[in-house]
Amino acid sequence: MKDYNIENNNVEEENPNVETQVVDNEEIVRLKAEIEELKDKLIRTTAEIDNTRKRLEKARDEAKDYAIATFAKELLNVSDNLARALAHKPANSDVEVTNIISGVQMTKDELDKIFHKHHIEEIKPAIGSMFDYNLHNAISHIEHPDHEPNSIITLMQSGYKIRDRLLRPAAVQVVKKP
């Protein structure tokens, strides 16, 4: 009988091992699924972080490019006034007036260089070109037999843009249909 008990003891001991192996296999499958889920979350989180970084870099670059926009808008009137002064210079003038005009011209040229350096472009549509509501502001409409409808007949004030952003539209007079 002792032998029989020993065999039973062995059998009883083997059963927990089988259950442990089954439980271990189920646990392995569950853990593998959890690992896959965590890998997926890691990939998604990494992609989200990368996208956030790219958005922040783009926002930083735009902020750098357009930070001077408000200041530039205020300088546009200065540029306009310098251009008006140069447009009305007298034909014949003495040395002092010529020197003043030369100084105004140098100031205007320097301001234009600064505008160019900061990607500020003048919008100066040609007479006869078509009106573009993205770049122009129609101050008035007149009939004119020699020009197409919706074409620009008079430039009243230059416009400006910084890169692709409009600072001020060009003020124009537009031909209307007769």
Swiss-Prot record:
Q: What Pfam families does the database record attribute to this sequence? A: GrpE
Q: Residues of the signal sequence?
A: none
Instruction: Please give the SUPFAM superfamilies that the UniProt record associates with this protein.
Output: Coiled-coil domain of nucleotide exchange factor GrpE, Head domain of nucleotide exchange factor GrpE
Keyword Chaperone carried by entry: yes
* GO annotation, biological process: protein folding; protein import into mitochondrial matrix
Where in or outside the cell it occurs: the entry states:
Cytoplasm
Recorded GO molecular functions are:
adenyl-nucleotide exchange factor activity; protein homodimerization activity; protein-folding chaperone binding; unfolded protein binding
Instruction: Give each disulfide bond as a residue pair.
Output: none
Return the Gene3D superfamilies for the record.
3.90.20.20, Head domain of nucleotide exchange factor GrpE (2.30.22.10)
Q: Which UniProt keywords are present, listed alphabetically?
A: Chaperone, Cytoplasm, Stress response
Superkingdom, according to UniProt?
Answer: Bacteria
- What Gene Ontology cellular-component terms does the record carry? cytoplasm
TM ranges: none
Q: What does the record give as the function of this protein? A: Participates actively in the response to hyperosmotic and heat shock by preventing the aggregation of stress-denatured proteins, in association with DnaK and GrpE. It is the nucleotide exchange factor for DnaK and may function as a thermosensor. Unfolded proteins bind initially to DnaJ; upon interaction with the DnaJ-bound protein, DnaK hydrolyzes its bound ATP, resulting in the formation of a stable complex. GrpE releases ADP from DnaK; ATP binding to DnaK triggers the release of the substrate protein, thus completing the reaction cycle.
What binding partners and quaternary form does the record give? Homodimer.
Instruction: Family membership, please give it.
Output: Belongs to the GrpE family.
Q: State the protein's name.
A: Protein GrpE
Species per Swiss-Prot/TrEMBL record: Rickettsia prowazekii (strain Madrid E)
